[in-house]
């Protein structure tokens, strides 16, 4: 396979057929979908979004949180919590984890998100830190909201999405 995401054709053949068998209340069944949901009842829909980033800068975790939260906001879901998994190269030290956690805590406090789980491990096959963020939220009355699109509620590169791009530009300019 080539580097990066698999193509939609490969995803349909190898993934979609497997997960489609008994799961009728879920969404997010395309290779390019950034979030998915599980309809619990007519009143509640649990929605989550995952983002992976890698790189040397501990600030990468900030972009991942903003991206995951932004994906939920684009679906009219207020993010409430994040779960974090971090893979480090064996050459990493504890200070890298502390730096990532400091930034993670700051961004979660700013955005009102709680941190529900943090897993960190090192592996010999990892060349630079890889951070996986999963944000979750609950959409109230999902069926009713899908029917009502109110003018002026469109998201056009603002909020978390616009913030992520702006922060990346600022960090690059300062470097």
Name the predicted role of every residue range.
Residues 1-175:
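Helix-biased detector of long, well-ordered alpha-helical tracts
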């Amino acid at each position: 396979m080539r580097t990066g995401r698999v193509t939609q054709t490969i995803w349909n053949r190898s993934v979609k057929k497997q997960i489609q068998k008994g799961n009728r209340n879920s969404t997010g069944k395309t290779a390019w979908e950034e979030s998915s949901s599980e309809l619990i009842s007519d009143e509640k829909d649990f929605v989550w979004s995952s983002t992976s980033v890698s790189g040397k800068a501990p600030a990468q975790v900030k972009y991942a949180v903003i991206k995951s939260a932004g994906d939920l906001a684009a679906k009219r879901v207020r993010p409430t919590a994040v779960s974090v998994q971090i893979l480090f190269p064996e050459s990493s030290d504890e200070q890298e984890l502390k730096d990532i956690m400091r930034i993670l805590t700051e961004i979660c406090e700013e955005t009102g998100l709680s941190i529900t789980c943090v897993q960190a491990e090192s592996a010999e096959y990892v060349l630079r830190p890889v951070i996986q963020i999963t944000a979750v939220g609950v959409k109230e009355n999902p069926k009713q909201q899908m029917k009502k699109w109110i003018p002026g509620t469109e998201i056009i590169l603002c909020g978390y999405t616009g913030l992520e791009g702006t922060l990346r530009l600022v960090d690059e300019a300062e470097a």
